[in-house]
Amino acid sequence: MKTIIIIPARWESVRLPGKPLAMIGDKPMIQHTWERACESNADEVIIACDSKIVYDAAIKFGAKVIWTPDAETGTERVFGVFKQKTKDVDFIINVQGDEPFINPKDINEVIKVVHSNPDKVATMRTDLIGNEGKDPNVVKAIC
């Protein structure tokens, strides 16, 4: 079963414009995220972007990149790539571009879940800390 990871990267981020290329150490955030995703058991990792500057940077560090039209959310951007890849892909995992410290083992757990339950949707989550539950910028999952 072919599983790919699509990493949406938006240059015009509302809260932090240019976020994909924000430097963490000596690498841009999107490169860290891509490298972690590449360490997983996914068959392919693709960056979906809307900006020439992000596209060029990702190509430079070796990523496969697909240009996507304007989208309101990262999930919309992932769906744009999904529509192009549906013929040869069984599962798509959406890893947000601002997850430079994501653990590849956690991605592998999601891969195991979707392979075992192909008619289900899986989402990684963690417990909220402190006032995160009230922060509109923190995504919440109801379990």
Describe the function of each predicted region.
Residues K2-C49:
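N-terminal glycine-rich phosphate-binding loop and ensuing alpha1 helix
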Residues K2-I4, F91, V121:
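Residue-level preference for the first positions of well-ordered beta-strands
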Residues P8, N94-Q96, M124-R125:
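Short beta-strand segments
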Residues W11-S13, G97-P100, L128:
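Short glycine-rich anion-binding loops that position phosphate/pyrophosphate groups of nucleotides
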Residues A42, K87-V89, S116-K120:
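Short, high-confidence coil segments that cap the C-terminus of an alpha-helix
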Residues I46, K52-V95, E99-K112:
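Short phosphate-binding loop-to-helix
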Residues N103-C143:
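Conserved core of the sugar-phosphate nucleotidyltransferase
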